[in-house]
Amino acid sequence: MLFEQWAPCKDLALVYSDRDTWDSMLQQGVQLLERFTQDGRVKIRRPRSQQQIQFTRRLTAGNSFVGFVDAIGELDGTPCVLEWKTSSARYPSEPEGIVALDPQLICYSWMTGIEQVAQVVFIRKRLVEVQYLRATISDQQRQEFQTLVEDTVKRIEAGQFLPHSGIRFPQNPCSSCPFLGLCLDQRQLIDTALVRKPGVDLGLFDELAY
């Protein structure tokens, strides 16, 4: 199946990183699947119907939130929502509880009503690795996420598009954030990104201490 899906890409004009080729990525994919199978920690009893599952949640204003869950199955015998990930590095597992803060896992739990969630991370490196991260999402987290969703819908309908941070996970380089440079007081980045409107007195910010 992997070869069948990957074979049509061989003749495409794809741009690979310095260390990657079509053959090397195929080999890594095979090795990752072999490791995943050998671990034997994940079970999906009905793979044809329990993967890429569509869920629809009705919101209070009459709107619908539509999402797709990667899979519902078991990790180490515990029923849970499963999320597949690929990465070139391990995801952080400390401090304790950090996995439960992942917005996508909270979303999956809210969509399905299932409190147990897990990430299965296929790590592409010289010695391949599969990482298993589990978390329990609380009722409070699900309620807060629904409030966030409904508030976001209201802002979209009102045409309010507020800036938000652009931190990438797990490496977390600041690459696409509207506040780039401000949090670390990097003056060159601030001068490049900051727009000063005519007639606005910003002198008070010179008095702030960080």
Go through each PLM region and give its residues:
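A residue-level signal for conserved active-site and pocket-lining positions in enzyme catalytic cores
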Residues: G29, A71, C177
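Non-catalytic protein-protein interaction segments used by genome-maintenance enzymes to assemble
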Residues: I53-C107
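Generic beta-strand structural signal
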Residues: P47-Q51, G67-V69, E115
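Conserved aromatic-histidine-acidic binding/catalytic patches
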Residues: S17, T21, S93-G97, I137
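Residue-level signal for well-ordered alpha-helical scaffold segments within enzymatic catalytic domains
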Residues: Q31, R35, C80, I106-W110
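A non-catalytic, helix-rich entry segment at domain boundaries
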Residues: M1-Q54, R58
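Metal-dependent nuclease catalytic regions and adjoining charged, substrate-binding loops involved
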Residues: I98, C107-Y210
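Secondary-structure boundary elements
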Residues: K43, G73-P79, M111-V117
